[in-house]
Amino acid sequence: MWIKELNLTHYRNYQQASAAFSPGLNVFIGDNAQGKTNFLEAIYFLSVTRSHRTKSDKDLIYFDERDCSISGTLERLSGRVQLEILLSDKGRITKINTLKQAKLSDYIGAMMVVLFAPEDLQLVKGSPNLRRKFMDIDLGQIKPVYLSDLSHYNHVLKQRNAYLKSVHQLDNDFLSVLDEQLVTYGSRVMAHRLAFVQSLAKEANKHHQAISNGLEKLSISYQASVSFEHQQEIYQQFMNQLKTTHQRDFLRKNTGVGPHRDDLVFYINDMNANFASQGQHRSLILSLKMAEVSLMKQLTGDNPILLLDDVMSELDNTRQTKLLGAVKKENVQTFITTTSLEHLSQLPKDISLFKVNKGTIERDSIMID
């Protein structure tokens, strides 16, 4: 799949902007704080209905305006698709081919993206919440049913925690009713995550071995808060552990076990990557991002769109070469933001170049030397 055009109205620092893209490589060039990342963020938002930079939709609306819109034309193997998101103080509306979508799980997945931004370098050492979000975003695009299961799980979890906080004496029978619902959806979420991480780990290791010239092995471990050895055991083990922690949950007023406590651990040559060098971290994340692209292609049969937000400056020459080589090999539509063409000499000469300046974007005819 590839996005053919994007239209913005009152988005960030863009009052009105439109751009038509090529199915290959598209480069946004401009000084800092001109709107390059905003444009890339809009593509990301159109796909996953969230920003990688802010939690508030209000931050996305142009100064003194009450609403904004992002729309785009997508070319998929199954045909052309029109996507649109409207944001206002009343909430948001998502549309596919002009039809409103009632649920996120009906919308997300229509356009798949993989984002590589500087903040991704915090994935290994950052909070577990970052790693859960990483799984949620990828799985939500690959398997719409995952978002439905996760949404139901979070709803029941909220109910269970609210009950624990509101009572002075525990009603184990009532809590068991909530447990049944929590385990039903939570075991599905964990099963999805387990299968995803197992597949992702294989792809990531392939890319990491290529980047390290065969000197390093990358592995990823899914650390579920529920102890189990096989996927078939998840439901029963989750139920057993919930029952044994009723008193603990009552005293602490929250639910101590479940996918909301899950984590990922990365290893390089069987050593926890928390202790890896900065260069190894960069290679790990680069491997992970290219693995996301490969896995989405394998599992859906269609290409995701790759978004590279100001990451060339974060990589040394060797890793830049590896990244650009992988981009060519994967043959996916790619967007790059940069302040300079210095690192792009290895790219095809027929790239689409866009100059971004003070909230305007225009096609440039400059070719790479």
UniProtKB/Swiss-Prot annotation:
CDD domains: ABC_RecF (cd03242). GO terms for cellular component: cytoplasm. Transmembrane segments: none annotated. One of its GO terms (molecular function) is ATP binding. It is found in: Cytoplasm. Keywords: ATP-binding, Cytoplasm, DNA damage, DNA repair, DNA replication, DNA-binding, Nucleotide-binding, SOS response. It comes from the Bacteria. ATP binds at G30, D31, N32, A33, Q34, G35, K36, T37. Belongs to the RecF family. HAMAP family: RecF. PANTHER family: DNA REPLICATION AND REPAIR PROTEIN RECF. NCBIfam families: recf. This is DNA replication and repair protein RecF. The gene is recF.
